[in-house]
């Protein structure tokens, strides 16, 4: 029971540190589109795709998968999880469900971001 928890925790620490570092270094370059965020989202998508394929053909302990996918990619970006879910739907020929999931994630995220901002300003009295 402890090895899975430690695997996730260690991966999470490393993913979060990398996200923070890339944000610090890359976001100031072109603030209109935070390059650190774009970089971690694209890298996370690549890493999770590669890792899912690799672990599907590997005899490694499941703890390595927890370290890379759940821990590292989960802390680096949640976009990587979203990406693999959409690609899995597309590979299964579920184009309609993939488009629906994309719409829900994208529109839902924007709506909840706006709701979060509005809630803050409402609570703060601004």
UniProtKB/Swiss-Prot annotation:
InterPro entries: FluC (IPR003691). It comes from the Bacteria. Na(+) is not transported, but it plays an essential structural role and its presence is essential for fluoride channel function. It is found in: Cell inner membrane. It is a multi-pass membrane protein. PANTHER family: FLUORIDE EXPORT PROTEIN 1-RELATED. This is Fluoride-specific ion channel FluC. It comes from Acinetobacter baumannii (strain ACICU).
